[in-house]
Each structure stands twice: as C-alpha cells, then as structure tokens.
Amino acid sequence: MALKKPKKSRLTTEEIKQQLEGSTIKEQSITKEVETSFLDYSMSVIVARALPDVRDGFKPVHRRALFAAFENGMTHDKPYKKSARWVGDVIGKYHPHGDQAVYQTIVRMAQDFSMRYLLVDGHGNFGSIDGDSAAAMRYTEARLSKISYELLKYIDKETVDFVPNYDASEQEPSVLPSGFPNLLTNGTTGIAVGMATNIPPHNLTEVCQAIKAYAKNHNVTISEIMEYLKGPDFPTGAEIYGDSGIIKYFNTGRGSVTIRSKYEIEDIGQGRVAIVVTEIPYMVNKANLIEKIVELVTNKQIEGISDLRDESSRDGIRIVIEVKRDVIPEVLLNKLFKTTPLQTNFSVNNLALVNGVPMVLNIKEMIKYYFEHQIEILVRRTNFDLKKAKERIHIVEGLVIAVNNIDEVIKIIKASGDDDIASKSLIQRFDLTELQTKAILEMRLRALTGLNIDKLKKEYEDLILVIKDLEDVLNNYNRQVNIICENLDYLIEKFGDERRTEIMYGVSSHIDDEDLIPVEDIVVTMSKRGYFKRLPIDTYKNQRRGGVGVQGLKTYEDDDVEKILVANTHTDLLFFSDLGRVYRLRGHEVPLGSRQSKGIPAINFLPIEKSESILTILPIDNYDQGSLFFTTSKGIIKRANLSDFESIRANGKIAITLKDGDKLFSVMQTLGNDEVFIGASNGNVIRFNENDAREMGRIATGVKGINLENDEYVVGTGLSSHGEYVLAVGSKGLGKLTDINDYRLTKRGAKGVNTLKVNDKTGNLVSIKVVNREEEALIITTSGKVIRLSIKDISVIGRNTSGVKLISLENKEEVKSIAIFKKEEINDEQLLQENDYNLK
C-alpha cells in the first residue's frame, strides 16, 4: 500500500505579507485596482483611439496615417506607392497596432461611398458598396488626395505642437492644421467606452459658407446658420425625409435623420412598371439590401414583386424591382421602406474631444472650435514667417555691410587662420553679429564678390514691407478673419460641389400606404358566389340606351353577378353579410381585377366564416352624418346610428339580428328626414318617412317596413334625397323613370302601390333606384355583361306602365342589378385602355 503524500498547508495572509516584504510586489485592493485600471483603459480608448479631435476631425490612427504619407512625399503630384509600404511606416513610426487596423483606415479614406471628400487616392481594388473587401495591401497602391494637402499644409511652420511617438524615437503632430473642415464635411463614427460618436458628413460649399457667416458675426444664430448649411450631405446621395431631425441635432448635437433611397418608376411595357433604385442610404450594404428583399419575398412578407435584379455598374447604382400588374408601385415601395434598408435612420451624436475632454456639440459649437483652430494656425504660421523674415533681414543687413567693404572683408578672411578668427575679426571691425558673420563666411568668395548691392537693398526693402504686413496680421483680428474667409472661398472654388442628398422638407418618414394611393373612382362588383373585384370607372364605355354592352365580369358557369356599386379608392366600404355581420375595408383594399377576370372570393380578403356570404356593400365617407337604414329581404327595417359602425374590429361585428329564414338586402345612409322607398318583386313600391322607424341598438332586429305576401321579396330601396325620379328595371331589360311624387306617402308596414306593370314582356321587377337626370347608370346582366348609360336618356313614364328597352339581351340573359353614379360623359368614339391585371 502506497503512502499518501502529506498535504501542503495553505499560507496565511500574514505569512504571505512576510514573504512579500522587501520585494517589488505591492499589496493592493482588487476593487481599487480594477477601478483604476479600467478608468485608465477607458480614458486611453476615449482620448487616444475612438473619438475625433474637434479641430481636425481625426482619431490618432487617421492623423498618423496622413502624416506618415505626407512625410514620405506621397502627395497627389507624386507616383503611387504600395499600400504595404505606407502601412509599414505608420506602424513602425507612430501606431504600434495591427497592420489590418491601419490598412482598413487607409482603405476607408479611399472609398467614395464612405467618404464625402476622399482623403486618399487609391489605385487598385479598395472594396465596394456590396461589402467586398479591398485587395491585400501588397497589391494596392495609394497616395494622398489633393484635398488632403489642405489638411497638412503649413505643418512645417510650427503651426501645431508635436509630441513624442510611442517610443520617443520620432515626433508626431498632436493635431493637423486642417485648412479643410474635415470633421464637418466628412463626419466620423466611433465607439468608445460608455460613449459613441456618429457625426454625419456635410457639403463643403455649405460648410464653408456657414463658417464665413460665423467668422463675420460670432452671434449668428443656428437658424441663420441653417440658411447656409442645410443638413447632412451623404456620399451615396439619397433623400432626407423631413428636417425635424436636422433642426434637433443642429441645436442639441443629438438627433435622428431619416434617409430614403432615391428611385424612379419606369414603364417596362405590356402595362407593367419597374421600381429602379438609383441611390441608397449612407452605410447601407447593397448586397445585403437585395438579400433582405429576396428574403421578404420568399417568406411572403412582401408581395407584388415579379423580378429583382442588380444592374449596377461603374456609372452608378441601379436596382430593378419589377412590379406585378395588380400592385400599386408606391404602396409596394412604402412597405419596402418600412421593412428593408431602403430607408434607414442615421442617429447623430456630435461627440468630439475639446481640449482632450469629450463633449457633445451643436452645429455652432463645431463651427466655433474649427474657426478658433484656424485663427490659431494663422497666428502661429504668421509668427513663424515673421521670425524667418526678421532672421533674413538681419542677414541681409550684414551682407550689405560686407559688399560695401568687400575688399577689406576679403583681406580679413584671407589673413585669418580659421573661421573662428575670421568671425571675431569681422565682428570687431564691422560690428556684425555671429549670425551675420556666419552667413558671410559660408559663402564662397566668388559668390560673395558677385553680390549686387542694389538687389540686396531691394530685398531689404521688400522684407521691411513683409515684416510690416505680418505684424499687421498679428495685431489686426479683422485681417485674420478676412484671411480665413479667403481660404474658405478658395476651398469652395477648388473643391466645392453640388449637394448630393436632397432634403424633402415638410414631409414625414412615416407614410401610410393610403397616402400613396390616388383618390380615384372605382366600380366594385360582387358575384352570387361571393367573388369580388375592383375596376377603374373608366373601364366601361358610355353607351346609348339599348346598347349591347361590354363584358364586365367573368364568372364561373354556375355563377352570376349579384351586386355592383361605385365608390372611390379612399372610401370606407362596409360589407354586410347574410348573418347580419359587418366588415370594413377601404376601396383600394378590394382586389383589383380586369373586365374579364373572375375576381377574388370574399373569404380570401375578409375574415368571414365558410358558411357566411357577403350580401351587400355600403360606401361611407363620413360617420357623423345620419343613420344606417337596414332592409331585409322579408321587408323588415331598422334604423341605427351610423357612428355605431365607425370602429369595427378586424373580425367584424354584429350589424343586425335577423329572424330565421331572412337575410339582409340593403343598407342605406340616411340624413335624418329622408323618405324611404322600398320595391318588391310583385312590382309594388312603398314610400314612408324614415322617422317612422326609431333608431335602435346595433344588435336589434327591427320592425316591418313593407307588407309582403307568399314568396314576395324586396328587390330595391332608395331615398328621396337621392333624386326626383324612381328608376324601375325589369328582368327583361325594360325600364322607366317615374316622378317620386306619383307615389303617395304612407306609414311603414303598408303594401305600397304598383310601379311596374309586371308581365311576360317586362319580367319581374329586378331593381328600383331613386335618381336624378344628371346621373348615369351601370346595368349588369346575369352573364356579366355591363352597359353604361345616362339617366337623361331614359323616358319618364307613369307609374303603372311597362317601360322602354334599356339593354338588349341575348337568349336567356336577364338584368341582374343596377348602380347609379355621377360622372362626366365619355363619348362613344373614345377608346378604352384595357387594364390587363393578372390576379394570382
């Protein structure tokens, strides 16, 4: 049996402390250490990595990359150099981090879809808006762009402070002179610890004009600045919807801007159109955008797209979305805007370092700090030039003395054993300074003897003027402002361009589909089996009385037309079912069809039960006007307040409680003192005041309206407010107009009086309508044929007559229903444009 090793006892805290005495290890609270270390790390990320300086708009990695290129002569007028060479210089001298981090920084500054104004001129594959990566740095070449020179110009004139690099072997600028307002024009984005920045790009011309406005009046308001600086201007163009977000971030430094793709609707022939997207929102990956649309179509979350393809090229973006025939392109676009990156929100957070401290800045503060930086650069540059001018004039003064005494100067130099003796001798003889004697001694004798006294005097006089001018600049603030403004004008002239992003003022990014649908008159038809469709009113010809008609509704062999009405695309349509329930749709929500199409069954677009069918439809424009007047096939009537039907749930609600064997025939909107007309299949019509039926609750059954016998049933209803005549139409195509005053006013519940002499020639009374002479009628037959005619062309005849022929019928064809509407007459010669919609 093996012996177990004795367990080592754990050291106590005191024993550990004793062992640590005299060592370099210090005892520290873990809580305090974590707090201190994390704070140090956070500040390092904020100040030295993630946030831009408000003066030049750069993070350290961008600043170091640009300075390294400038230092190595990689300017726009020099040949391209390998990107790997550039990256190596940055890493080796200034930025000891990963090569890919530095390379991606350079790549982004060369991408025209990322930068509003390119700072790097790239040669080779620098990535694409589809998210393609740039080629490896060993393959690509780059150099600074023309505008980058403005950022670094005068850096050699002590305009900015230099600091040691990471190992104190080199000096790097703490900030760039930035003669070009980079932060405002190119923007930036970055995530620090506990904070993030997201500054949008703006148009250079507008930014320069805004800075000039501030330079000339430091009390300029943000509203006045907005007269020059309109808002963001993104490299990818697109449109900004509304200016409320712009106003907010201009004033507070924070806000949200809605960016929407720019598009055109093109006709692609055969009655079809395509949505062509030409500009997309900033920072949107085009490939991912297309993939998202495909995903939504595949999952049937978006319907109405027949084809999608990317035809983008070097000339620009072109995403083609082919639209199905039965889809309104603006409505489809609105859905795409809501569900895809075709519309995005840019959340602005103007966070930048001000004297090393992170601050959220409004637009005026950003302009202010940039302007103050330019004043400082100008002053430091002027001081540098002044110092150099004074040094030069001092040298020129010495050279003038030397030329005036050239023989003696040469004699002293030749007689001296070395430069030190010569310098002392010249100083002693001519009262020169060491700088002057040094300049004299550094010249060859030939050059010294060749100096022209007149040229020296001219240079001296010029230097006097230069010094005077430079001193005036330093002492005159107005001159400093003017110089800054002149530089801004130079930037506008050389680099200014037109705005790419259009701002849509006074609009909302939240647009309902209906806002995009034009208000148009429509015809809604319903078949006996419950098939519905919507057609433009102009689908039908206006024909004279007795015309043959056009095919208006294609139905199944055992189906025929039941109802037809006229409304518009924005009208509320209340669908009343045989079970006494009501459902609501807008006119444009009814499936669109053509003259020959079958239509769509109600169960496909209404939440009805399988045993339920729609019997009538009522268009409503205003729920505050009047009542609803219900009539059933058995002559039961009910009056209800229209406002009770304004709020209808998605699954509908009860409209009337029906007795066994009865069904709803019609629902009319009354105005409070209307006279009601009800026609029966026996040819009788009753006329009574609507107030004979008191208003009842929504689920009430109602009272008797007309006295019917045996198998008689209601065939038509109307109101006195509808017109001056009763239009009566028989099943055989005969009809007539009769003055409403020919019908005596009775109480509800009576049998009524005869309106159509029913016989084999007329057939049963099919429908009655109350009309006026300015209206028009659509008459629809059991075969689906439709004729449109003017009421004024129908004869006015007495009550107890058969009428005249309104429509020519074939074989066993009969009149099924009629609809009345107001419409400008269309001449017989006018051709109709066939709307060949393909319903799926």
Curated annotation (Swiss-Prot):
One of its GO terms (biological process) is DNA topological change. Its EC number is 5.6.2.2. Residues 51-516 form the Topo IIA-type catalytic domain. It comes from the Bacteria. Pfam families: DNA_gyraseA_C (PF03989), DNA_topoisoIV (PF00521). One of its GO terms (cellular component) is DNA topoisomerase type II (double strand cut, ATP-hydrolyzing) complex. The keyword Cytoplasm applies. Gene3D superfamilies: 3.30.1360.40, DNA gyrase/topoisomerase IV, subunit A, C-terminal, Topoisomerase II, domain 5, Topoisomerase, domain 3. One of its GO terms (molecular function) is DNA negative supercoiling activity. The lineage of its organism: Bacteria, Bacillati, Mycoplasmatota, Mycoplasmoidales, Mycoplasmoidaceae. This is DNA gyrase subunit A. PROSITE patterns: TOPO_IIA. The gene is gyrA. Belongs to the type II topoisomerase GyrA/ParC subunit family. The keyword Nucleotide-binding applies. Keywords: ATP-binding, Cytoplasm, DNA-binding, Isomerase, Nucleotide-binding, Topoisomerase. A motif (GyrA-box) lies at residues 543-549. A type II topoisomerase that negatively supercoils closed circular double-stranded (ds) DNA in an ATP-dependent manner to modulate DNA topology and maintain chromosomes in an underwound state. Negative supercoiling favors strand separation, and DNA replication, transcription, recombination and repair, all of which involve strand separation. Also able to catalyze the interconversion of other topological isomers of dsDNA rings, including catenanes and knotted rings. Type II topoisomerases break and join 2 DNA strands simultaneously in an ATP-dependent manner.
